[in-house]
Swiss-Prot record:
Its EC number(s): 3.5.4.28, 3.5.4.31
Protein known as: 5-methylthioadenosine/S-adenosylhomocysteine deaminase 1
Top-level taxon of origin: Archaea
UniProt GO MF annotations: 5'-methylthioadenosine deaminase activity; metal ion binding; S-adenosylhomocysteine deaminase activity
Organism field: Archaeoglobus fulgidus (strain ATCC 49558 / DSM 4304 / JCM 9628 / NBRC 100126 / VC-16)
Gene: mtaD1
Amino acid sequence: MILIKNAKILTPKGIVEGNLKVEGKKISEIGGKAVKSDVVIDGSRKAVIPGFFNTHTHAAMTLFRSYADDMQLHEWLEKKIWPLEAKLDDKAVYWGTKLACVEMLKSGTVFFNDMYFFPEAIARAAEECGIRACVSAAFFDFFNPDLLELNLKNAVKSLREIEKYDVLRAIGPHAVYTVSLDGLRRAAEIAEEMDIFMHFHLAETEKEVLDFKKQHGKLIVQALDEIGFLSKRLIAAHSVWLEDAEIEILAKKGVSVAHCPASNMKLCVGKAIRYEAMKRAGVNFTLATDGAASNNNLDMLEEMKFAALLQKFHHSNPTLLKAEEVFEAATLNGAKAFGIKSGVIKEGYEADIVLVDLAKPYMQPEHSLIANLVYAASSGCVDTVIVKGEVVVEGGVFRSEEEELKIIEKANEVAKRLTGSA
């Protein structure tokens, strides 16, 4: 049992000052008396908040952080990223993912939804680090029927291999410009048969949308709906260049959208996601960082601020995407997307908890905790992180300094090998 004493607890009904008790993997009591516990955490001058759910990542791309920046998207991919990715192996992905897990946990993220190569290495790294994850078996067919059969077979094989790990699973058909409509239809059938999620890039750029419409004579979401691709299993990353009719379809089918504001701005996708239209339609709107090669960090505190400011600036309206809304997108909505009873501090919910240090200068004065978290905070305020009832970060340190330093060292060795600078 874990007892957090004398904290400011952010609940759905407001801030409760007092104690919080964790039994097993659940929050068992809020505001009760202090009792003898296995672990006692002093919550003085700290706030208890729900952990963040990062709903679209390529975790091992931490290895490419700041390797290639300030470039056009296609040039960036073709000249810098893809040549390095061709050299990846399971060891590289394992250490790159571990580095990402440490970074995410230390900035308050308790869950990430990943799409990358070598899913077994990703699942193993996540489980060892004690973070929640949904691991995708990425799938491409490049419009080649033979490649479709081969790569689908390999994806299913990978999904079966990671079943032994304590992670959720997804099939990850990459995008409409790398996977045929038949491949997308087959991926949806596999997700249904295996009772797993789907992870997909949708309408990230105008070029993607225009090329698809020229080829198929219809909007992407309409075509996806016709082949049975859309459901509550689907997490659609980006979803920037969508029309009203498409947004309505996504809402009707229960699709969750993963908004990646920092990556969208850095890679210049051309406009801001249509948050207000999604809100009106009832789309489950979540938040994500994308990969560290295009962000360049995995800090959800920073991502909340980017999301809110992008809407305000793009639409010249300071009232859009309020602090409370973006905080919910980063926590509760992400948990909802994956059917996890988490994302809020509430009795009976999963103990995915972050303690933030209110003594930091940028967390004062305390007019509004949520506004401070969204507009003022940095990852430096994260003191303690609990995932599934287990303490994984304490005093701002991931488990032990020795383990953290080893992960950083190994990831650097791999990065140097990949770039030829070893």
